[in-house]
A protein has these predicted regions:
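Short amphipathic alpha-helix that is part of the acyltransferase structural core
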Residues: 11-60, 69-74, 79
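A generic fold-level signal
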Residues: 19, 65-66, 185
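Charge-rich, low-complexity intrinsically disordered segments
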Residues: 185-255
Length: 262
């Protein structure tokens, strides 16, 4: 049963009402990877954030790392947004944020803290303008991952005009900024959310961010797919899915990477 606060805003109610139409999918199949990389490209080109490339995809080396997981949010069966996460610990200290802001983040790893770095956020540029909930629901992947992996911090590297979203709704704080990435046209800032301080407030204010154990197990591990279970229901009627990994999706990714960096 979904959590039911005494009162909910119309905004929260609208998102909760949307949830049964949503599939939160762990991306593993070559055709799904290709669809996500094309969505990234469309979104970034539409916002003039990257240079065009012949392949029409946006992919980088971080997509190939062992601590990387890529997700797609499907509305009525159509890919509507995507997010990539890296689970970052002292044993797996690799993620885009570490490269750009290592002087701030590496000391935290040395102290035994951990991160979930959410990156390559993108939303279908041709979506219905009324679907203002998509950014919240896309960030939900990183939030669920932070809960599942008991991460100390949730990271997001964003351009300045998006910072208010993370500050207002998720309690993120700016740790550093004004950095230029080699593939991105606009300077970015590092925003960090302390899960120890923010989780209870987020759960209360944005109840649709919550998830059950089965949903997180489906998305962030292979335990259920290995048992032949490919989908489960979330707290609010949404579906979480995780397909069986193909034998060699990496060969496709490396081929695309050679012609579509950005």
């Amino acid at each position: 049963m979904s959590p039911t606060p005494k009162t909910r805003s119309n905004f929260v109610e609208s998102i909760v009402g949307l949830m049964p139409r949503l599939e939160f999918r762990r991306i593993k199949r070559a055709e799904d990877f290709a669809e996500v990389f094309r969505l990234r490209y469309r979104a970034y080109i539409a916002n003039e954030l990257i240079e065009p490339n012949q392949r029409g995809m946006s992919i980088d080396n971080y997509d190939l790392l062992e601590n990387c997981q890529i997700f797609g949010l499907f509305l009525d069966g159509n890919l509507s947004s995507s997010l990539r996460i890296h689970r970052v610990t002292a044993d797996t200290p690799w993620c885009p944020a570490i490269k750009s802001f290592g002087e701030y983040l590496k000391p935290e790893l040395e102290e035994g803290n951990s991160f979930v770095d959410g990156s390559r956020f993108c939303v279908e540029p041709s979506r219905d303008p009324e679907l203002s909930a998509l950014p919240f629901l896309t960030v939900r992947f990183a939030y669920m991952a932070s809960v599942h992996f008991a991460a100390t911090y949730n990271l997001s590297v964003v351009r300045s005009e998006h910072a208010a979203f993370y500050r207002r709704y998720y309690g993120f704080e700016r740790w550093a900024g004004g950095v230029r990435l080699d593939w991105y046209k606009i300077p970015v800032d590092l925003y960090v959310g302390d899960m120890r301080e923010n989780r209870s407030r987020i759960d209360e204010r944005l109840p649709f961010m919550q998830s059950n154990f089965e949903e997180r197990l489906m998305l962030f591990t292979d335990e259920l797919p290995d048992q032949g279970i490919k989908s489960v229901k979330g707290l609010f009627g949404n579906t979480a899915t995780n397909s069986v990994r193909e034998n060699s999706p990496g060969s496709n990714l490396r081929e695309w990477l050679d012609s579509a960096v950005g």
